[in-house]
Amino acid sequence: MAKKLKTAIILQAREESVRFPNKVLSRVAGKPLILRLLGRLKDSKLKNQLIIAIPKNNKNDKLNNLLKKNKFNVYRGDEKNVLKRYYNAAKKIKAQIIVRITADCPFSDPKLIDKFITILKEKKLDYVSNTLYPTYPDGLDIEVFTF
């Protein structure tokens, strides 16, 4: 029997957007945008864990408090180095496959995420994405890779 690899969705989020400050906390149909997105991500059937990677600074405390209040797993890391934040979040939870989602892609589709995870596993690939050659509308960006 094949070993089951730990698959984690890591959502990159922050409050201090330049074009639309506090976008992730903006309300859509009465609920913060980030909670709507997380509700969709939770529906992925092939993920073992969902973690939100946010900068460790006081500018993101409101976001952190909202996520903790709603019982989400949060990793707070390097403010400037997003790659380091991702790496440390993945290392903390011992992920073997990472699904990279950004909070500015609020329409992430859990079925599409599961499809990409399946492709990565079945074809024994290291990387699957719909961003190298845009094949889906903006807001549906997904990257899946081994770690």
What is the predicted function of each stretch?
Residues 98-99:
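Short aromatic/hydrophobic "clamp" motif used to bind/position activated sugar donors
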Residues 55-60:
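A conserved acidic beta->alpha catalytic loop
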Residues 47, 94-95, 122-126:
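Short, high-confidence coil segments that cap the C-terminus of an alpha-helix
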Residues 140-147:
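Short glycine- and hydrophobic/aromatic-rich loop-to-beta-strand nucleating segment
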Residues 68-80, 91:
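Conserved donor nucleotide-binding strand/loop of the catalytic core
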Residues 33-50, 63-65, 69-70:
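A short, N-terminal amphipathic alpha-helix
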Residues 1-21:
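N-terminal nucleotide-binding beta1-loop-alpha1 segment
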Residues 86, 105, 109-135:
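Conserved donor-nucleotide/metal-binding helix-loop-beta segment in metal-dependent transferases, i.e.
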